[in-house]
Amino acid sequence: MTQVESWRKVYSDVVGEKVSLDLNIFSDNYDEIIFFGCGSSYNLSQSASFFTKSLLDGRSCFTLPSSELLINTDIYINKDKKYLIVGFSRSGETTESINVVKLLKDRQNVTSFTFSCKEGSTISKFSDYHFICKGAAEKSIVMTVSFSSMLIAYCLMLTKLLNNKDMLNEFKNLSNYLGENISKLFDDVEYYIDKNNFSSYFVVGSGFNYGLAVEADLKMKEMSQTPSYSYHLYEFNHGPKSLINKESLCLILTLSKSLFKTEEIIKEILNLGSKVLLVGSKDISIVDSKNIDYLLSDSNFKFDIIKSFINIPIFQILAYIKTIKKNLNPDKPKNLDYTMVI
């Protein structure tokens, strides 16, 4: 299943109520919501956590790698508080994530809600609530469609619970926009890589985009074996910029109107010799340089947090094409397995 097809199916399942969902799970008065996962699933957890804070008026929530929650359980789980733990695992068979749910299953103050892409998974059997993104589990070791599908499924559920019809409609438009542009996007990215070789890769993003930046870094690193790094937008100036040179590419994820002095940051990156690739509209940050290019510059979304989803196919395609150009197999990265079982 392609990314566009998967997003449309998830939308139909969640918003069209083709799958039975008990959205009251979000309505309970939890003291904290903890998101967890491993690898790419941990990265999407960071964005899911920010989305939750944004829609639930700063509800207390945070993100942990599954292993951290597993080995330091009593530090993060207080017996006097009520928790919702939300976990993500493509296969539903990742050892650390399963063990988190099993460990906390009998605690009366903890409710678990997990997402996976395969039916009958072990994690679903131990979870209080579970959602399956059917058809989103790619055969490749690398998570692409499954990553975005689980993230968009969670975000749609929360949006539906709040009955935010404007956001739900924009999520629908998101799938249509991607469907109209995906073929051209492949061509544009390949053309860009052919014209702009790079040996190091930086991705910066703030808020919801930080989790995506870490995932973009991971995709390039694991697939193409290119040294890659990810940072919050404004943290990039506090040390990491020392690594930039003329052989670098800096991918700047979609900018929101709430950000400040982005032009200065972009200009400094350019002055250090790096090439810059910016996702989204030019009207937010106008910088004139032969070393800056834009992708999906015609994108126009009312909600910045939904616009952020257009970053995902871009950084996945960038990593894929870079890998192909280096004569590596994008589906079987070095030293990696489909599911981590310990």
Protein language model features and the residues they cover:
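N-terminal amphipathic/basic leader segments beginning at the initiator methionine
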Residues: 1-8
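Glycine-rich phosphate-binding loops that contact phosphosugars or nucleotide phosphates
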Residues: 28-175, 206, 241, 249-301, ...
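Conserved phosphate/anionic-ligand binding catalytic regions in large, soluble enzymes, centered on
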Residues: 35, 41-48, 213-215, 219, ...
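Active-site phosphate/pyrophosphate-binding segments
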Residues: 8-29, 129-251, 259, 326-342
